[in-house]
Amino acid sequence: MDNQQRKVQGSSSNTFIKRAFQHLKSLFTVCFTGADYLESDIELICQNEIQPQGLEKLNADSSNFYCNSLTSNQSLTTSMEALDLSSSLTTPHADKLLKLSNLIAAKSFTTERKLSAAEFLDSREIHNPFTYGFLGILYGTSRTPYLHAQYANSFMSESAVPISIELNNREAKASMNLAEKNFPEGFEDFVSFLENPNIPLTVLLHHVMLYDLYSNNLKDAVWVAVTNYMKNLVGNYGYTELHIRAAQQMFGHPRFLLVHPEDIYCISGSSDWVCVSTQHFHCNIHVHSVSGNAIRKSRNPIIQDLSSICQNSTEFGWLALTHALRKKGAIFPIHAYLNFNAKLYEECIPPSILYFNKNDENINVGNIEDITNYMYETFINEASLCDKFMKRKHERIETPLSSQGREISNTLSRKRGAKGSNPFEIENMMPHA
């Protein structure tokens, strides 16, 4: 591809990004005011400048967008407060991106460590790689984060109206806590299994997305699983020893640590926004302040330890950003981000915006008996899945992990079938779906 072709492609991509975000902001206003928005819902965003190349390959179309996500589920309700807040934010057109080393916090790190700016600081603007796919905006506070999301392609159809999500999972946490108390053996056995290496990405991601509902014991196991997964990625996707140490120290949120560091960018001309961007995923993230002082002056031993092993401005920028996000990462759609690479779903867009499985949404509204049954079946199925995964990986050679998978699955079944093991199933019947 010659320079002229690259210019045309870059210009087309930039125009698409701008129009898509203008459309998104207009739709936010409409959702809040209740006004009609029919004409521009079917307008051609890119005016034939970009064709939806390979769209059929992803089994995607404009209507494939969370059609069933607006439920009575308390974690998935449209938030008027979120829509109101969005109107006070100036969302940047993220057509020009910069590497994470361009954060102010990262630049100060380069100066203080007397590092070569040429070696560690790359200020060249990068064209946004996004062409079509998942388009979102994450903002709010750590206490109350919000997410706007929609599917965006060349044609913005009326079915692509964005959803405004407020993370409110207090009742789900209480329900999960009661389920764990009523079935402690199952949770304890699955903790020991989750802490073993080489579990499938689907199992890991499922529990990463349930992380905020879990007890401390199970949260610790999720972090161990994330650490084991990331150890296999060091040297790829921007992962370094810093990121492994961060996972070991349970720093940040596990959802955000699964984002490949090389896909995180600064937005040119904006100090309050960063983004995660790939060819088929783009999410703008509002951060109030990414300050190097918060890292340098922190008395938190974990932050001090992580800061001491930063080798360059990009690593320090990632550390400062992760610290600034805090628990806002709890609503980051990590499954949508990984879906286009790992093909986790048959659909182009995940069926649930907040959880890995659509059925996980029932934890917010189900009774304790149903939740206990659901988690039991989940543990059994995933232990079996891990066993099959290890068999394929080692070509049916017996391994300690595959043996443990069967043992835990059988142990759970025995415990579940024992008299009195389930307070909700008097006759000890197998749980229903």
Curated annotation (Swiss-Prot):
Main localisation: Golgi
Biased composition (Polar residues): 401-412
Keyword Hydrolase attributed: no
Compartment(s) of residence: Golgi apparatus
Superkingdom of this protein's organism: Eukaryota
Keyword terms of this UniProt record: Golgi apparatus, Meiosis
Gene Ontology cellular component list: Golgi apparatus
Summary of the function given for this chain in its UniProt record: Has a role in meiosis.
GO biological process: meiotic cell cycle
Record-given protein name: Meiotically up-regulated gene 131 protein
UniProt-annotated stretches for the region Disordered: 401-433
Similarity comment text for this entry: Belongs to the UPF0300 family.
